[in-house]
């Protein structure tokens, strides 16, 4: 009987959710933990990815200070595993991070492209705006 040698497949660890040491560079360096991450880590990664995509595609503008405030606020959001990262970013943008009332101009702007980036409707967006207003 031939001895069979088993070796790990190339990139198998990464595909199975192992650590991936690379950052998105928009919000600074980040470490992704894939499936091993807890709900807060996965939500944080989702927020970071949604923000990066929206800014890159020219849908919204957030300066570095606003980006930092968005990411640092993730810890204040309860039950992050039930939240939509895209909705959270859009709600942040429409309410200026929960600082003010719902900005009708920004709300109208988000409605103009919302169908391209998410399957949410206006009611969902308003709920995420209210989430940010409640976090004041």
Swiss-Prot record:
Q: Which Pfam families match?
A: DUF5770
Give the highest taxon in the source lineage. Answer: Viruses
Matching InterPro entries, A to Z?
DUF5770
The entry's protein name is Uncharacterized protein 045L
């Amino acid at each position: 009987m031939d001895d069979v040698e088993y070796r790990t497949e190339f990139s198998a660890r990464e595909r199975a959710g192992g650590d991936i040491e690379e950052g998105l560079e928009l919000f600074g360096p980040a470490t992704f933990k894939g499936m091993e991450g807890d709900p807060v880590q996965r939500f944080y990664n989702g927020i970071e990815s949604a923000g990066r995509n929206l800014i890159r595609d020219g849908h919204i503008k957030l300066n570095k200070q606003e980006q930092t405030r968005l990411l640092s606020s993730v810890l204040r959001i309860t039950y992050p595993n039930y939240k939509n990262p895209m909705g959270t970013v859009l709600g942040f943008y429409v309410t200026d991070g929960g600082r003010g009332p719902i900005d009708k101009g920004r709300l109208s702007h988000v409605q103009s492209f919302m169908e391209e980036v998410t399957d949410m409707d206006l009611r969902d967006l308003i709920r995420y705006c209210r989430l940010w207003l409640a976090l004041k």
